[in-house]
Structure formats: structure tokens, C-alpha cells
Swiss-Prot record:
Pathway: Secondary metabolite biosynthesis. Part of the gene cluster that mediates the biosynthesis of the antibiotic 2,4-dihydroxy-3-methyl-6-(2-oxopropyl)benzaldehyde (DHMBA) and its derivatives. The direct non-reducing polyketide synthase dbaI product is 2,4-dihydroxy-3-methyl-6-(2-oxopropyl)benzaldehyde (DHMBA), produced by condensation of one acetyl-CoA starter unit with 4 malonyl-CoA units and one methylation step. The FAD-dependent monooxygenase dbaH is responsible for the synthesis of yellow pigments derived from the oxidation of DHMBA. The roles of dbaB, C, E and F have still to be determined. It comes from Emericella nidulans (strain FGSC A4 / ATCC 38163 / CBS 112.46 / NRRL 194 / M139). This is Derivative of benzaldehyde biosynthesis cluster protein C. InterPro entries: Dimeric_a/b-barrel (IPR011008), Sec-metab_biosynth-assoc (IPR051807), YCII (IPR005545). Induction: Deletion of the conserved eukaryotic csnE deneddylase subunit of the COP9 signalosome leading to defect in protein degradation results in the activation of the silenced dba gene cluster. Expression is positively regulated by the dba cluster specific transcription factor dbaA. Expression is also controlled by the transcription factor flbB. Disruption phenotype: Does not lead to any phenotypic changes.
């Protein structure tokens, strides 16, 4: 079995089209479900410009951050390319893995 590494991945959001991101979220979550169950997607969530000041306030989403367990950078990039957010143009693949 190949050696697996934990990759910290930051993906900036397309600030010009956050409505499409919100509408695509159900497909994004469904896509991630088997990755979570397999232990490939260790954790993830939105990154924010600021924390909400009050309950119910809209989140100022500027991207996502996640930990992906994989054997290579190319595997991580492929997982990101297959995500509905990436297919929508909501993330920058070139900037995704650091």
C-alpha cells in the first residue's frame, strides 16, 4: 500500500458568484460523502473573511479549507477537479495545494 499524507488544501471562492456556490452546495456535500466515509477527506469547511457577529447572520465565505489524505499532490488535485465547486469554476485548481 502506498504511503498516504495529509494535505492542507485552501481553495479561494469566486467572490463574484457566491450565489452559484450556495446553490451548488448540496451537490458538493453529496460528492464529499464517500470521501469522508473512506477517510480520504479528513475534515473541511468554509473559510470566512470574518466571524458572524450575530446568530443567523450570513457567512462571509471567501473559500474552503480541508485536509485530504492521499498519496500524491496529483491525487489531491484530481479530487479537487472532480468537486462540483471546481466544475462550476468556484475554486482555483492552480492555487489549491500548497
Amino acid at each position: 500500500m502506498a504511503q498516504l499524507y495529509d494535505w492542507l488544501v485552501e481553495t479561494p471562492a469566486n467572490a463574484e458568484d457566491l450565489e452559484s456556490r450556495i446553490n451548488t452546495r448540496p451537490a458538493h456535500l453529496e460528492h464529499n460523502k464517500p470521501l469522508i466515509e473512506a477517510g480520504t477527506l479528513v475534515w473541511g469547511g468554509p473559510s470566512l473573511a470574518a466571524h458572524p457577529k450575530a446568530a443567523g447572520e450570513d457567512l462571509a465565505i471567501v473559500g474552503s479549507v480541508m485536509c485530504i489524505r492521499a498519496g500524491s499532490e496529483e491525487e489531491v488535485r484530481e479530487m479537487i477537479r472532480n468537486d462540483p465547486y471546481a466544475k462550476l469554476g468556484q475554486v482555483s485548481i492552480r492555487m489549491s495545494v500548497k
